[in-house]
């Protein structure tokens, strides 16, 4: 699989003075998990994030991804698009399990999928992302206990895996084009790098 279509473990970790704890910021195509009392932060437009944790141990994490457009078969569960989405979810879940989480204790909160990217309205990228994450978690038997999906506004999401608490701020006005440009660049990278290639799914 191309370097650009791999999910990367986020490396932007800093001290958040507002919440008085270490925090990890994740960008499109990244994920982060921890067993520590940390904060995970991201800003979502058309992308989606699944915040998944073991409700007993507090081991949890978050991803940030979008489904690439794979043409007419985009809604097929075996399309390149769905396979990439499955991969993005499985990478996070498998790392949680390796860190000591138990599958039967996993719960999820899901966010994003807004109609934010211009030119992507025809393919309803935000709606497809939102529906995919719902369907995936249902098939995997992971209960969604909260969601804030679709709409037209970007969101800033603060996730506290240890407690499961999430704070969501709707961004009704963007001061610059950073978010849109970042997601557009991510979408273009997914499109130009064949996601139908070698994607390994873990059992």
UniProtKB/Swiss-Prot annotation:
It catalyses: L-glutaminyl-[protein] + H2O = L-glutamyl-[protein] + NH4(+). Its EC number is 3.5.1.44. The keyword Hydrolase applies. The keyword Chloroplast does not apply. Keywords: Chemotaxis, Hydrolase. Gene3D superfamilies: 3.30.1330.200. It is an enzyme of class 3 (hydrolase). One of its GO terms (molecular function) is protein-glutamine glutaminase activity. One of its GO terms (biological process) is chemotaxis. It holds the Pfam family CheD. Belongs to the CheD family. Probably deamidates glutamine residues to glutamate on methyl-accepting chemotaxis receptors (MCPs), playing an important role in chemotaxis. This is Probable chemoreceptor glutamine deamidase CheD.
């Amino acid at each position: 699989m191309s370097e650009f279509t791999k999910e990367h473990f986020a490396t932007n970790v800093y001290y958040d003075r507002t919440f008085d704890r270490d925090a990890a910021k994740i960008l499109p195509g990244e994920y982060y998990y921890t067993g520590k009392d940390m904060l995970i932060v991201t800003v979502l437009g058309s992308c989606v994030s699944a915040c998944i944790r073991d409700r007993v141990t507090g081991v949890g994490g978050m991803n940030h991804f979008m489904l690439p457009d794979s043409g007419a078969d985009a809604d097929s569960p075996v399309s390149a698009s769905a396979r990439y989405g499955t991969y993005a979810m499985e990478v996070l879940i498998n790392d949680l399990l390796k860190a000591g989480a138990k599958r039967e204790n996993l719960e999820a909160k899901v966010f994003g999928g807004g109609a934010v990217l211009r030119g992507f309205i025809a393919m309803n990228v935000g709606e497809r992302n939102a529906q995919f994450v719902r369907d995936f978690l249902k098939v995997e038997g992971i209960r969604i206990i909260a969601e804030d999906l679709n709409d037209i506004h970007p969101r800033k999401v603060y996730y506290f895996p240890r407690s499961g608490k999430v704070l969501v701020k709707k961004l009704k006005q963007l001061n610059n084009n950073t978010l849109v440009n970042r997601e557009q660049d991510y979408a273009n990278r997914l499109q130009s790098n064949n996601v139908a290639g070698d994607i390994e799914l873990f059992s």
